[in-house]
Amino acid sequence: MLNPENIRNFCIVAHIDHGKSTLSDRLIEKTKIIDERYHRNQMTDDMDIERERGITIKSHAVRIPYTAKDGKNYVLNFVDTPGHVDFSYEVSRAIASCEGAILIVDATQGVESQTLSNMYLALEHDLEILPVINKIDLPAADIDAAKHQIDHDLGLDSDAAVAVSAKTGENIDALFEAIITTFPPPKGSRDNPLQALIFDCHYDPYRGVVVHVRVFEGMIKPGMTIRFMNTGGEYKVEETGTFVLDLVKQDSLQAGEVGYIIAGIKTVSDVGVGDTITDAAAPCKAPLSGFKEVKPVVFSSVYPTDTNDYEELRESFEKLKLNDASLTWEKDSSLALGHGFRCGFLGLLHLEIVQERLEREFDQSVIFTAPSVRYKLTMRTGEEIICDNPADYPDEGLIASAEEPYIKATLITPTNYLGNVMSLCMEKRGVQTNMTYLDEKRVEMTYEMPLAEVLFDFYDRLKSISRGYASFDYEVIETRPTDLAKIDILINGKPVDALAQLAYKPSAYDKARLVCEKLKDEIPRQQFKIPIQGAIGSQIIARETISALRKDVLAKCYGGDITRKRKLLEKQKEGKKRMKMIGDVELPQSAFLAVLKTKED
């Protein structure tokens, strides 16, 4: 029987690209839980997208054995977490299942914005924090500066920081010993009533839902009937086990352990991430506190390219939702694109990942409309409505006022790029609320700005103007009054509802012009002239024209009378006019994608 005193549960958190997954690889490699032949980079990242982009999207739990220098055998359960701000909810879920957190600081970059936000997240859950300085093998590494920042910026004890190289494995032994001494063993007893937190789940096509749990009190074993305290569902446990990269069957899970349960759960909606599991026969008194439910901030409509694939797309979303608890979707329809779904995402990266997963894992060909945020509208009647879809936007005359969501953005930038970063924030309607010099080379700034402005190209432009050195983290704070307008896009005089966008009125002209220019490049030429117009209400504010393809009707006239030529040209003109009246323009999928990527180049 495993003694809880010999268990350590911790997660690995850091800013993007500071080396979380590489450190996980070294921890796994050092304990030799898998054969050297099967070693590869990013062992904890399962998805092809994660490997290709070199990012972590899903948190991944791993259990490794370790024999300490004092001869005792320990079991370490750790969770490798994502670094991107879009997936910070994954980090909060991992943190809720641990007693400690390894906070990695890159020796070449120092403390960045998500280093701070992840530390605050860990402190909120009373986690013990172990600072680790990574990438000490690089020529540009400055360990003393990193230690100073850990002391000064994070307020942690820099003497306790372990300097390692996750790439070469240097100093990994010292890190293992620090994990044992720094992190406390889990509390709880196997004799108490069962209390376990669901911190994740995934779908297995053969066995149903695999629930990831951290047992706080009591024990779970096959044959027991368990109850989900939030939803009230009861299930008989078929199998319990732990994660050693793959699922490894165990006889039971007891207080302090992290593992999985298979209980014949067939539908995704029955598993609430953050719910508490207890014994149906002897339930515990109260559920665990769980964690904040994640709210989507970016909305987009998704349509199948072929309208006959609607049912297949719905099934794909149901399966995707199981592995991605933060994705929300409901039915939607468009005159131009038929039936589809209105989806909520955590950010643009999340939207891109969902799009790629639909195409790769489920073989779906889909069209995404331009992303939008959730606006709060007050009607002249006094009624308040929430609108995230331009198609549902009421007539402007009926709206008394509109509010849009604002974010509190934390930016850390080298002083050389301070002017560039400030002018970008001002261009995006940001208002500076705080500015602190962390040291002579780095500045931390806080801005309040509309979420809609950050959606499109803010992150890309921030990275390019600061040569990749500035970092950015944000949280949604509140809604504030705004001057809102709906831009309709008309093609050949007909509005295309899927291309409509909601925008800040003073910048509506630029936005409409950009969309029209993009569409002009994407829509193939026809036999007749095609006007592309951007309009607010009945007022046209931008226009581009795709010129017609013309057959040379004068080719057969050699010399001859001008009236004969004129007659042929007039006849062609009449035919074109008639064609324009009945001609429909087919929009290629690339036209919708081009609108998604509308940027000031």
From Swiss-Prot:
Keywords: Cell inner membrane, Cell membrane, GTP-binding, Hydrolase, Membrane, Nucleotide-binding, Protein biosynthesis. The keyword Metal-binding does not apply. CDD domains: EF4_II (cd03699), EF4_III (cd16260), LepA (cd01890), lepA_C (cd03709). One of its GO terms (biological process) is positive regulation of translation. GTP binds at residues 17-22, 134-137. GO terms for cellular component: plasma membrane. It catalyses: GTP + H2O = GDP + phosphate + H(+). It is found in: Cell inner membrane. One of its GO terms (molecular function) is ribosome binding. Residues 5-187 form the tr-type G domain. It is a peripheral membrane protein. Gene3D superfamilies: 3.30.70.240, Elongation factor 4, C-terminal domain, Elongation Factor G (Translational Gtpase), domain 3, P-loop containing nucleotide triphosphate hydrolases, Translation factors. Its EC number is 3.6.5.n1. It comes from the Bacteria. The keyword Kinase does not apply. HAMAP family: LepA (MF_00071). Belongs to the TRAFAC class translation factor GTPase superfamily. Classic translation factor GTPase family. LepA subfamily. Required for accurate and efficient protein synthesis under certain stress conditions. May act as a fidelity factor of the translation reaction, by catalyzing a one-codon backward translocation of tRNAs on improperly translocated ribosomes. Back-translocation proceeds from a post-translocation (POST) complex to a pre-translocation (PRE) complex, thus giving elongation factor G a second chance to translocate the tRNAs correctly. Binds to ribosomes in a GTP-dependent manner. This is Elongation factor 4.
